[in-house]
Structures are given as structure tokens and as C-alpha cells.
């Protein structure tokens, strides 16, 4: 797998996300409610998806009272709000593949918003399945290198079933198959605490290097606009910024 061995794409986007904490909380709450409603139990001990959602919420410092309120809302029989899980796929400029995962209570609204964003920034929305063959669907768990050493991570993953691990000076990324994700996440959380990030997502099999500043800015704007939608949970793509372009954009 490629694209997530370097932290700079993630680091750039995290800076933007930090300015939108309220939107992040909205997405986390929506996932908690959906996980509690659609899982086999609203008890995280018996509901892996809810357990994973709670870990993600805590990694983003979602207040406990808001977590509890979300679970109570899911348990409330009078709450008829239901979210549909929808995946959108398409291409951004420069042939970059994009996968958008959404939780929405109005699929027509969300489809229109996503399509409009692709069109506005020079991309094209395709059919579901049009680009997912360029990615691997798997679990991802990330720890900062200043929190856990490479030696400790390598030692830990010997005890559980993981697909791959990449490390650099900034971050360790552990990849798992979907079936083992919850088990590995629970094991690592017990050993090293809540990770920097954890999710089931789409990781590019290969990446396309963006070495032009204008192309990079247009691509990043599309990703940013997509992520700004309350309905969109995550955006995945197969681009990688070159070192020079990354440095220019960070310094802008």
C-alpha cells in the first residue's frame, strides 16, 4: 500500500481540520448514533462498530457528556432520525481518484452537494465502483512517533494479526484487515492509549505525485470542500504532495 507512509498529506489536512472542530464533533456524533442504532447492541462491549466510534471520538477529545448524549439519543425510541451510509467515487483534476464516505438523512441533498463540489473544482463524479479498485479497504491505526517508539510498535504488532506497518520520524501507521481491526485497535489502545487516528477506510495501492503548486491547491480545495459537508465522514484519495510543493503550501 502507498500514500500513507508519509505524514505530510495528513498533517496538512489535520491543520485545516483543527479549525473546524465543531464539524468534526458533528461527524463523530453521527457515527456514534448510527453505530448504536445499527449494531447488534448499544453496549460497546458487544458492538465493535460503536466501540471503534467511541475510540475515534475520544482521540478527538469529544466531551464525555456529548458522547453519552449521542448514545442516549440512539436509544430513544422517539428518535426517528436515521442515517444512510453512501459511498461516492470520482476523479479530481490530474487524474486523482477520490472516494467520499457519507452518513446522510437525505441522499438527494448529499449527492447534489458532492456532485457540485466535484464539478466546481474540475473533477467528475462517477458511479460507485468506478475508482475503488485503486484502493484497499482496510483498517488503519496511527500513533505519533513521539508517543510510541518504532521498537515498541514492532514488538506489539508481533502479538496481533496485522497486514502491514509503516513508520517514519512522525507517525506509525498500522494496517489491518477489516475483520481484525477492532481486535487490533483494542489491543493497541490497552497497551499505548488512544491512537492519533483509527478508522476503516480506503488506502491507495499506489499514489500520484502532485508536483505543481496550482494543481495541488485546486486538489486540496476540493478535498477541503468535501470534508466541510456535515454529511461527509471521510474523504480518501490517491495523491501525494511532492516535498517541494508541500513546503511551498505550508509556507503560504
Swiss-Prot record:
Domain of life, source organism: Bacteria
Localization of this protein: Cytoplasm
Alphabetized UniProt keyword annotations: Cytoplasm, DNA-binding, Transcription, Transcription regulation
Record Gene3D superfamilies: 1.10.10.200, 3.30.70.980
Cysteine disulfide links: none
GO cellular component: cytoplasm
Matches recorded under SUPFAM superfamilies: YebC-like
Pfam families: TACO1_YebC_N, Transcrip_reg
Main localization of the protein described in the UniProt heading: cytoplasm
Molecular function, one GO term: DNA binding
InterPro entries given in the database record: Integrase-like_N (IPR017856), TACO1_YebC-like_2nd/3rd_dom (IPR048300), TACO1_YebC_N (IPR049083), Transcrip_reg_TACO1-like (IPR002876), Transcrip_reg_TACO1-like_dom3 (IPR026564), YebC-like (IPR029072)
GO aspect biological process, one term: regulation of DNA-templated transcription
PANTHER family, A to Z: PTHR12532:SF11, TRANSLATIONAL ACTIVATOR OF CYTOCHROME C OXIDASE 1
HAMAP family given in the database record: Transcrip_reg_TACO1 (MF_00693)
Similarity comment: family membership: Belongs to the TACO1 family.
Protein name per its UniProtKB record: Probable transcriptional regulatory protein A1E_02520
Amino acid at each position: 500500500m502507498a500514500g500513507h507512509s508519509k505524514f505530510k498529506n495528513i498533517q496538512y489536512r489535520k491543520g485545516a481540520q483543527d479549525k473546524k472542530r465543531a464539524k468534526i464533533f458533528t461527524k463523530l456524533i453521527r457515527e456514534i448514533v448510527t453505530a448504536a442504532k445499527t449494531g447488534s447492541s448499544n453496549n460497546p462491549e458487544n458492538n465493535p462498530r460503536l466501540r471503534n466510534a467511541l475510540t475515534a471520538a475520544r482521540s478527538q477529545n469529544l466531551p464525555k457528556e456529548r458522547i453519552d448524549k449521542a448514545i442516549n439519543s440512539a436509544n430513544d425510541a422517539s428518535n426517528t432520525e436515521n442515517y444512510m451510509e453512501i459511498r461516492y467515487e470520482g476523479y479530481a483534476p490530474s487524474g486523482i481518484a477520490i472516494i467520499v464516505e457519507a452518513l446522510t438523512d437525505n441522499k438527494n441533498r448529499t449527492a447534489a452537494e458532492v456532485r457540485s463540489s466535484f464539478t466546481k473544482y474540475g473533477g467528475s463524479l462517477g458511479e460507485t465502483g468506478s475508482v475503488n479498485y485503486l484502493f484497499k479497504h482496510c483498517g488503519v491505526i496511527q500513533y505519533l512517533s513521539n508517543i510510541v517508539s518504532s521498537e515498541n510498535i514492532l514488538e506489539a504488532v508481533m502479538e496481533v494479526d496485522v497486514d502491514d506497518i509503516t513508520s517514519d520520524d512522525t507517525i506509525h501507521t498500522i494496517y489491518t484487515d477489516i475483520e481484525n481491526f477492532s481486535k487490533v485497535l483494542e489491543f493497541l489502545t490497552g497497551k499505548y492509549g488512544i491512537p492519533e487516528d483509527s478508522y476503516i477506510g480506503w488506502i491507495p495501492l499506489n499514489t500520484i505525485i502532485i508536483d505543481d503548486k496550482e494543481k495541488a491547491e485546486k486538489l486540496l480545495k476540493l478535498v477541503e470542500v468535501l470534508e466541510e459537508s456535515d454529511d461527509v465522514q471521510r474523504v480518501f484519495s490517491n495523491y501525494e504532495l511532492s516535498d517541494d510543493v508541500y513546503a511551498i503550501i505550508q509556507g503560504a
